[in-house]
Curated annotation (Swiss-Prot):
Biological function: Required for normal levels of the cell wall 1,6-beta-glucan. Involved in a protein folding machinery chaperoning proteins acting in various physiological processes including cell wall synthesis and lysis of autophagic bodies.
Glycosylation-annotated residues: 81, 101
Signal peptide residue numbers: 1-19
GO CC annotation terms, alphabetical: endoplasmic reticulum membrane
Name of this protein: Protein ROT1
Pfam families (alphabetical): Rot1 (PF10681)
InterPro entries on file: Rot1
Length: 244
């Protein structure tokens, strides 16, 4: 009986920890360039258009009920010709799961992933230097940490890849997250949406999102408040000890 009670308690505590981890992830996170964000500013599913940001970077968004969105813009230099860098834009969304060991597993909706590869000096660039295609790639991260950056006071997400190497840090940009609808955007069955109905669904989703008072996280005021509160507490405690 004691063993059964222990196991029940163990699983309950484990579920609570996973729930707290999911709450920590909620929001839209962006890399230091602060130019790449998930949502309609990166991918237009109605026009099948990936929109190139001003600077390279990455962005991830997470909801508390297990949905995610990914926006990647990477530029790779060409060692043989520095004027011919290769650019890649990738959009995916789907569901994510936090495993009991703290790893993060993301499963995309296969019909919705898109990739735009731009190679201005490639072999087949006489007609078009860009290749637009479907893209699907499951992702597994070994672990992640959410913390407050000691330098700028912003919330920071540090993700570690499957081999344990850290990715570039991400910073909280929007909460609630800025995302497209979490269901399939490009269904392929007989009940496929028209562009008009898809446009209306996206518009309705974004309108509902704005009603949640999504806000951009750029101020560190609340962190400064707690910092100075802690300093004041330490000073008060020191004064009491000194007077005694």
């Amino acid at each position: 009986m004691m063993i059964f009670s222990f196991l029940v308690t163990f699983f309950i505590l484990g579920a609570q920890v996973l729930g707290e981890n999911m709450k920590e992830l909620v929001g839209t996170w962006s890399s230091k360039s602060n130019t790449v964000f998930t949502g309609p500013g990166f991918y237009d599913p109605v026009s099948e258009l990936l929109i190139e940001p001003d600077l390279p970077g990455i962005s991830y968004s997470f909801t508390e009920d297990g949905h995610y969105e990914e926006a990647l813009y990477r530029v790779t230099s060409n060692p043989k010709n520095h004027s011919c860098p290769t650019a890649t834009l990738i959009y995916q969304h789907g569901t994510y799961e936090i495993k009991s060991n703290g790893s993060l597993f993301m499963t995309p909706i296969a019909v919705d992933g898109r990739q735009l590869l731009s190679d201005p000096c490639g072999v087949d660039t006489e007609n078009d230097a860009s290749l637009y295609s479907r893209y699907v790639q499951k992702t597994w991260f070994k672990k992640f940490q959410v913390m407050v950056d000691s330098y700028n006071g912003r919330r920071k997400l540090q993700i570690y890849q499957f081999d344990g190497s850290p990715m570039q840090p991400l910073y909280l940009a929007y909460k609630p997250p800025m995302m497209l609808p979490t269901s399939a955007l490009n269904p392929t069955d007989s009940a496929s949406e028209t562009k008009s109905s898809l446009r209306k669904r996206i518009k309705r989703s974004l309108e509902n999102q704005y009603r949640t008072n999504a806000r951009i996280e750029t101020s560190s005021a609340k962190y400064e408040f707690w910092w100075w509160t802690a300093i004041a507490g330490i000073g008060l405690g020191s004064a009491v000890i000194f007077l005694h």
